[in-house]
């Protein structure tokens, strides 16, 4: 494979990774309809719902449709991340603030030994996963390049229309991509360049925030792709 003309600086590598991921995601989401977008493969899924039909205690959103969310907790799959935060010198109090849980809950996680119990977090719909990504990228832009004042969870008007959701989502993603493309080397290394209020962004160099955004995008798009595959064959396996 030739490498002539290929840039290998940190930002270019991250942007190339993101661009390839978004190209694949755009193709993978082609033809998404409303029924598939809102499809609940099993009972008890988290999704987007009308505000007066919300089934979770912390559902949020600025409009008629809200995104399901349960009470704050640290899922078993994130125990290793909490241990990493503690090992890096982050205080228990700060970890608790990042996860919106009590200090006692963080101490319980850090004291855990052996394999964590399986997570009981409900399965989520394509609508939930796409909406989750949408508000994170909207908030990511706001708290790094915008006015740093809007609550990310109130920035996206969730919709039951797949076409409308995708149009708005890609506009948000494109705005993030354009802004990140102009970041300087100094800004990449600036701790707190992003003040995103949920998570550890204010304590991280911005290069780590960008890498984390890439990972979050790939992670959720892979889940959406699998749900699309299951939707396509749903009649075959539902009768077994």
Model segments located where?
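Generic beta-strand or strand-like secondary-structure segments
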Residues: 105, 128, 132, 168-171, ...
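Short, charge-rich amphipathic alpha-helical segments embedded
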Residues: 104-112
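Short, contiguous alpha-helical
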Residues: 1-81, 111-155, 194-240
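Short, amphipathic alpha-helical "recognition" segments used to contact nucleic acids or chromatin
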Residues: 74-90, 105
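Short alpha-helical "recognition helix" segments of helix-turn-helix
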Residues: 94-98
């Amino acid at each position: 494979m030739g490498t002539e003309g290929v840039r290998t600086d940190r930002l270019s590598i991250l942007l190339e990774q993101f661009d390839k991921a978004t190209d694949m995601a755009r193709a993978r989401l082609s033809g998404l309809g409303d029924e598939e977008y809102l499809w609940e493969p099993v009972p008890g899924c988290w999704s987007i719902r009308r505000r007066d039909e919300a089934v979770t205690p912390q559902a949020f959103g600025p409009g008629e449709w809200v995104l399901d969310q349960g009470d704050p907790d640290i899922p078993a799959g994130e125990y290793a991340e909490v241990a990493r935060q503690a090992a890096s010198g982050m205080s228990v109090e700060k970890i608790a603030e990042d996860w919106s849980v009590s200090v006692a809950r963080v101490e319980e996680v850090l004291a855990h030994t052996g394999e964590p119990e399986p997570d009981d977090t409900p399965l989520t719909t394509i609508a939930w996963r796409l909406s989750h990504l949408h508000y994170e990228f909207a908030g990511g832009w706001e708290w790094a390049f915008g006015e740093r004042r809007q609550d990310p969870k109130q920035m996206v008007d969730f919709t039951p229309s797949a076409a409308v959701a995708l149009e708005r989502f890609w506009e948000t993603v494109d705005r993030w991509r354009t802004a990140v493309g102009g970041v300087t080397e100094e800004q990449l290394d600036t701790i707190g360049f992003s003040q995103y209020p949920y998570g550890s962004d204010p304590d991280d160099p911005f290069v780590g925030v960008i890498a984390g955004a890439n990972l979050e995008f790939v992670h959720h798009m892979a889940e959406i792709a699998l749900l699309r595959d299951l939707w396509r064959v749903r009649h075959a396996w539902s009768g077994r």
